[in-house]
Regions:
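Amphipathic alpha-helical recognition patches that constitute DNA-binding helices
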Residues: 1, 22-25, 41, 80, ...
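AMP-binding/adenylate-forming domain of the ANL superfamily
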Residues: 1-3, 18-19, 25, 128-133, ...
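Conserved adenylation A10 loop of the ANL superfamily
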Residues: 3-16, 141, 167
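Conserved donor-binding loops in enzymes that form glycosidic bonds
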Residues: 5, 46-47, 71-72, 90, ...
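Conserved AMP-binding/adenylation subdomain of ANL enzymes
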Residues: 14-43, 47, 51-91, 160-162
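Alpha-helix N-cap/helix-start capping motif
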Residues: 20-21, 97-98, 125-129, 172
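Gly/Ser/Thr-rich phosphate-binding loop
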Residues: 62-65, 90-94, 104-165
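Single conserved hydrophobic/aromatic residue that forms the stacking wall/gate
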Residues: 166-175
């Protein structure tokens, strides 16, 4: 189906070949679990050499959802990014944490809050609580999902649907 290189976090990056069956099984489960349908508009952030894009591409092919390829330059200008999401009525984003943090770090929501977003998923890094909560305040009714999985297992092997606003733990809570 496709081959992609790992990040090399355990040494030298290696090429991984992901077969048709793995991709089909993963996308069947992913779209069913998160309710992706032909009414969704998926805003693609990930380049095609990053396995996060697999979820965007094949979820839209399986369900008939619209796939909007967001121009890379939009991620340098939150106003352009938020205009793009709003103009295209994007409902679903499956982004790297750093892409979500660009919006909050540069105070993008002071400019605009795209109205159609209802599924916000992220992976690839730890999501800082401050940024997660900033998104949650803007989208209290949206589904927020933290995804995790190595390239070798076809994208993701676990997820957590976030139901609460979080506060940073006190050092006393860690004892």
């Amino acid at each position: 189906m496709y081959s992609i290189f790992t990040s090399g976090s355990t040494g030298v990056p290696k090429g991984v070949i992901v077969n048709h069956r793995s991709t089909i099984d993963f996308i069947d489960c992913f779209t069913e679990t998160f309710g992706i349908t032909n009414e969704d508009v998926i805003g693609n952030q990930a380049p095609f050499d990053f396995d996060v894009s697999v979820k965007d591409i094949y979820s839209s092919l399986k369900t008939g959802a619209t796939l909007q390829l967001i121009p890379k330059m939009c991620f340098s200008f939150p106003t352009k990014l938020l205009d793009f999401l709003d103009d295209r009525k994007v409902t679903t984003i499956i982004w790297a944490v750093s892409a979500l943090c660009i919006v909050t770090t540069l105070n993008g929501f002071e400019y605009k809050r795209p109205s159609s977003l209802n599924k916000i998923m992220f992976s690839g890094e730890v999501m800082p609580i401050k940024h997660l909560n900033a998104w949650r305040v803007q989208y209290p009714d949206a589904m927020f999902v933290n995804l995790y999985g190595p390239t070798e297992i076809t994208c993701n092997c676990t997820y957590y649907i976030i139901c609460l606003l979080y506060t940073s733990p006190s050092p006393r809570d860690c004892s």
